[in-house]
């Protein structure tokens, strides 16, 4: 099917081209931009709903503000595809989230129009405030700094910390609150739009400031009463009292899809001489594309799809996804133990806890985008004898590391961490890769750190975690499907700190921590075919390490290779430290560790990226051959 014509958009290379258009053309431009966004994401997949919800806002911001001199900071970044199209990247928009292509988020190295990188939520106001203060210190001519943040991201404490600081500094910062769930705003309409225009006008604010200066000369009781009266009157009509208390001048709510409402308000706040202002904009995810508007998740994250029908093109599943295996196992354990509760930070579907919530609604807690709170909330429940499972992506657990140490680990509280999206995640790239959890958890005293080699082992670890009450315990698992194992009704209890041997050999030992085991087994077959007797061991635990097993592997083999899908400093580092302490590196043992390189891994196909860094069967065999001084030309035979 041919693409829809976009004659206005075809004239836009950069925002200065947009600003050359008359305002009367902007509605049509927004329609074309929405069409182009839908068509591009239908090819690549990605985050569609959020971007469709801010098309008019994106056009208005680049029209009113002098980007890139003025800075627009997008929180999270899911909504930035229209922004990328308008800022010189339309010719590459169909490479979104592909290896070597555009990032799915804002990225400083990608464009001058991306002043701050994103991926995790609730950072935009802090970054914007930092830029505002830096600009003032440099005595630059007045520059507008605009932070665009969603109402979901406003559930994180960091956003309020930044607003509190901005209010205290009286910094000249513009915050656009993109309320796309109607969780804050009352219904919008002509009266609301009129009031927003009225209170955003410089004359109104100037009068307000003069009254404030005059009132400071009056007695305190008069000042307090006047302030409360003004807040009541304006808050009653247009809301915003909370933001007023934080020191922000509040404007809104206004219809974020109506350019006649957006443009005058943005022009007014652009001219404010000082102080922080918050513009409350109401939008709708998936706006303008019927399949997205009708979908329960508003097409938040989609595969490639048919533009006409909206039907997503999904690959055939060969096995149950690890997330679903975790969900199944947790539900099974919860039927046996009414002390088990599930906790997630705004990711019930992504972590599989939505199914748990259907079965046990009173034992499921979604705390919003508040990972720090989630962990300490779990700690509090553990204090009272409950068994909390904090289901969280590896990348987001980083946000709560102090709570993991201070509130859980030091107190030896039995909080269970189900760490999803561990390892390389593919299209979401460096900001979402689960690279560091092994490293930052295994360094904590008496913290049990597990990783399953397949989906059956994951079920065993869920049961083991449920039964473990001596302190914190974690297990990590990747995005995507398992290997197709037949699943038992319920997992088995594992002995803490004990691995297992899958194959016995005599010359080469391959020990794997996690789901790279499928590649390890293929590599073992290839090594055996080359005449190298190979042992395969499943570590199961990075901490406590199975010292007896590791000692035996070191003493009985010429080559020992440790394999994990994580950063430097993880399982392999702990193994090497143990071997060094035991003096097992002094008698000719050739030890190699395969893990992520010392770099942030960008978006791309997991198969291709993991192959490039040597974490596939070919890389494992190459590592063994290199250790033995063998030629590696025959290795390509072992392609999976």
From Swiss-Prot:
**What does the cofactor section's free text say about binding?**
Binds 1 Mg(2+) ion per subunit.
Q: What is its EC number?
A: 2.2.1.7
Q: What class of enzyme is it?
A: transferase
Q: What Gene Ontology biological process does one annotation of this record name?
A: 1-deoxy-D-xylulose 5-phosphate biosynthetic process
Pathway(s) of this molecule = Metabolic intermediate biosynthesis; 1-deoxy-D-xylulose 5-phosphate biosynthesis; 1-deoxy-D-xylulose 5-phosphate from D-glyceraldehyde 3-phosphate and pyruvate: step 1/1
Membrane-spanning parts? none
Which residues does the annotation say bind Mg(2+)?
151, 180
Q: Where does thiamine diphosphate bind?
A: 78, 119-121, 152-153, 180, 289, 371
Q: Which InterPro entries match?
A: Dxylulose-5-P_synthase, THDP-binding, Transketo_C/PFOR_II, Transketolase-like_Pyr-bd, Transketolase_C, Transketolase_CS
Q: Which UniProt keywords apply?
A: Isoprene biosynthesis, Magnesium, Metal-binding, Thiamine biosynthesis, Thiamine pyrophosphate, Transferase
Any Pfam family matching the protein: DXP_synthase_N
Family affiliation: Belongs to the transketolase family. DXPS subfamily.
Job description of the protein: Catalyzes the acyloin condensation reaction between C atoms 2 and 3 of pyruvate and glyceraldehyde 3-phosphate to yield 1-deoxy-D-xylulose-5-phosphate (DXP).
Among PANTHER family, the record links this protein to:
1-D-DEOXYXYLULOSE 5-PHOSPHATE SYNTHASE-RELATED, 1-DEOXY-D-XYLULOSE-5-PHOSPHATE SYNTHASE, CHLOROPLASTIC
What is the designated name of this protein? 1-deoxy-D-xylulose-5-phosphate synthase
């Amino acid at each position: 099917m041919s693409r829809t014509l976009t004659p206005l958009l075809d004239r836009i290379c950069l925002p200065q081209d947009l600003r050359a258009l008359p305002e009367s053309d902007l509605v049509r431009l927004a329609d074309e931009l929405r069409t182009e966004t839908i068509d591009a994401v239908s090819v690549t997949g990605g985050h569609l709903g959020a971007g469709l919800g801010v098309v008019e806002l994106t056009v208005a911001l680049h029209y009113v503000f002098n980007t890139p001199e003025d800075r627009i900071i997008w929180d999270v970044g899911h909504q930035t595809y229209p922004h990328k199209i308008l800022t010189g990247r339309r010719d590459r928009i169909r490479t979104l989230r592909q290896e070597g292509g555009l990032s799915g988020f804002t990225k400083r190295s990608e464009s001058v129009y991306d002043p701050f990188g994103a991926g995790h939520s609730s950072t935009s106001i802090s970054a914007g405030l930092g830029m505002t203060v830096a600009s003032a210190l440099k005595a630059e001519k007045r520059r507008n700094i605009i932070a665009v943040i969603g109402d979901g991201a406003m559930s994180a404490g960091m956003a309020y910390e930044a607003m509190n600081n901005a209010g205290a500094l009286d910094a000249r910062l513009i915050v656009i609150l993109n309320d796309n769930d109607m969780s804050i705003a009352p219904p919008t309409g002509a009266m609301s739009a009129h009031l927003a225009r009225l209170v955003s006008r410089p004359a109104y604010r100037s009068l307000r400031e003069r009254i404030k200066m005059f009132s400071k000369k009056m007695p305190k009781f008069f000042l307090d009463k006047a302030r409360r009266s003004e807040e009541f009157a304006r808050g009653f009509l247009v809301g915003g009292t909370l933001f007023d208390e934080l020191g922000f001048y509040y404007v809104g709510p206004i219809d974020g899809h109506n350019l006649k409402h957006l443009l005058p308000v943005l022009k007014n706040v652009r001219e404010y001489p000082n102080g922080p202002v918050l513009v409350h904009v109401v939008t709708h995810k998936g706006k303008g594309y019927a399949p997205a508007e009708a979908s329960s998740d508003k097409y938040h994250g989609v595969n490639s799809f048919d533009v006409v029908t909206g039907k997503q093109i999904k690959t055939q599943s060969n096995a149950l996804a690890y997330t679903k295996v975790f969900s199944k196992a947790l539900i099974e354990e919860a039927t046996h133990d009414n002390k088990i509760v599930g906790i997630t930070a705004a990711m019930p579907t992504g972590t599989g806890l939505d199914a748990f919530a259907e079965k046990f609604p009173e034992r499921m807690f979604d705390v919003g985008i508040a990972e720090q709170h989630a962990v300490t909330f779990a700690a509090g429940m553990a204090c009272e004898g409950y068994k909390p499972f904090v289901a969280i992506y590896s990348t987001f657990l980083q946000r709560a590391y102090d709570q993991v140490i201070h509130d859980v680990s030091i107190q030896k509280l039995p909080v269970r961490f189900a760490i999803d999206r561990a390892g390389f995640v593919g299209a979401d790239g460096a900001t979402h890769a689960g690279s560091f959890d092994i490293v930052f958890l295994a360094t904590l005293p008496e913290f049990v750190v597990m990783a399953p080699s397949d989906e059956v082992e994951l079920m065993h670890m869920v049961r083991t975690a449920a039964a473990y009450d001596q302190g914190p315990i974690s297990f990590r698992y990747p995005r995507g499907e398992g290997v197709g194992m037949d699943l038992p009704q319920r997992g088995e209890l594992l002995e803490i700190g004990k691995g297992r041997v899958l194959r016995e050999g005599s010359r080469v030992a391959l020990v794997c921590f996690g789901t790279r085991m499928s590649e390890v087994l293929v590599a073992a077959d290839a090594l055996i075919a080359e005449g190298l007797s190979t042992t395969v061991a499943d570590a199961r635990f990075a901490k406590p390490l199975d010292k007896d097993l590791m000692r035996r592997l070191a003493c009985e083999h010429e080559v020992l290779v440790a394999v994990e899908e994580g950063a430097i400093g993880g399982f392999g580092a702990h193994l090497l430290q143990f071997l060094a302490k035991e003096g097992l590196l002094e008698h000719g043992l050739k030890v190699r560790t395969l893990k992520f390189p010392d770099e942030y891994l960008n978006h791309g196909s997991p198969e291709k990226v993991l192959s490039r860094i040597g974490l596939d069967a070919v890389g494992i065999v190459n590592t063994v051959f290199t250790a033995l001084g063998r030629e590696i030309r025959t290795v390509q035979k072992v392609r999976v």
